[in-house]
Amino acid sequence: MENVLSRKTKIIATIGPATMNQNVIVEMLKEGVNAFRINFSHSSHEQASQIVYLIRSAEKIANSRVPIIADLQGPTVRLGDFNDIEVNRENDYVISENEGIIVNEDVFYNLVETGDTIIIDGGRFWAKVKEKNGRKLKVRFMTEGVIGSRKTIAIQGKEYPLKAPTEKDISDLQFAIKSGIEGVAISFIKNKEDVLKVKEIAESSGGSVFTISKIETISGVNNIKDIVQVSDYILVARGDLGSHFPLVKIPEIQRHLIEVALDHGKPSIVATQLLDSMTVNPIPTRAEVTDVYTAVTMGADSLMVSGETAVGKHPVDVIRWLNDIAFEAERNQNLRVKGKSLDIYDKFAEGVVMMSELIDAKLVAITTTGKTPMRLARFRPKSEILAACESEFVFKKLQLTYGVMPVLLNSIKNDQQVVQELKALKFLKAGEKIIVTRSLKQGVTDAIKILEVQ
């Protein structure tokens, strides 16, 4: 339990058939889950409503409040409906509209060519196109297994010329807002306009959601500096990145995306196959442990699991392992991951972090928008950041930021009142030195006080 309370890296878990159970969700919350994800590629509105109800009910039992993230499907191409097909590396197989592996999308046939590498189900299946005859392909698989309906299909090194958001995305976004879901993950982003469109739709629908931009295309990587400026979070979607780039490039792309996020003061999330073997096995591989550890030391704010908790056999154990690995990475390394100071307020925040370490003081950030604790977090202080806020939306938004412990107060009148409430809630003790920082005008960090808790 000490690890759960001390861990600074945040954990996001996907809810699916394996975890659509209130007791399991309660256990995951107790093990330290900071947010839950609903994948709208696989969930109907009826199923999503049930998931929201289960999470909110579990929160009351576990005495916890966490954000829910709606992960929009985005403009992607998926297989059609067909009976499962077992493929091997010895035989040729057909991809067509009416036999073999079914694909009904014009955009796929317009883009695919002989010699292309096709990637199905986020990298689980790889095939080489041997022949193309109109809307019928002959392919040879490089991997083996059973392929089922509705899996994603991509062409390595190529992007489908599809616009975002789709009609389904808009419908799902509006549903999410009505359901009180706080965050939205935007899939297959190519440029900042894709993010701005989703924000406009959310605002016109009367909702407040924080945005997570999923970077998983060639254009998304190339335009990351523009995208990150209009996003609340960025997500390194390694599955689909592996469909567009050679796999050996993924570690450096991950490092680059995390560094760009840090440089712009935006938190980052690393996802896909973190503990994939735990979908079946109760213990992760050594390579998976090293992968998660490395993501933390690179500077990721959050770790997100998908199939491991959505359909896996050991969802609660997955959270325990993530918690322990992240805690170990933080404990054994002096994580001096730092972004660049962009303006005078960033330099001010960096100075506050340095001062807190020089005088061994805890950090208290009083915030209305969440920007002050986020500014502090990017410089990775040794102390936890207590973020006092009045807004439940800001409280939940901050739960995905490294080292930030948001605290929801009924009202904020002055610094002393906040400090005394934090003491009453046992976040602070008498005699502790603290640095209280806040903004005198919205959106900036420009005021501090050094106090001793009375």
Can you name each region flagged by the protein language model?
Residues 1-454:
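Non-catalytic helical/linker scaffolds that mediate oligomerization, partner binding
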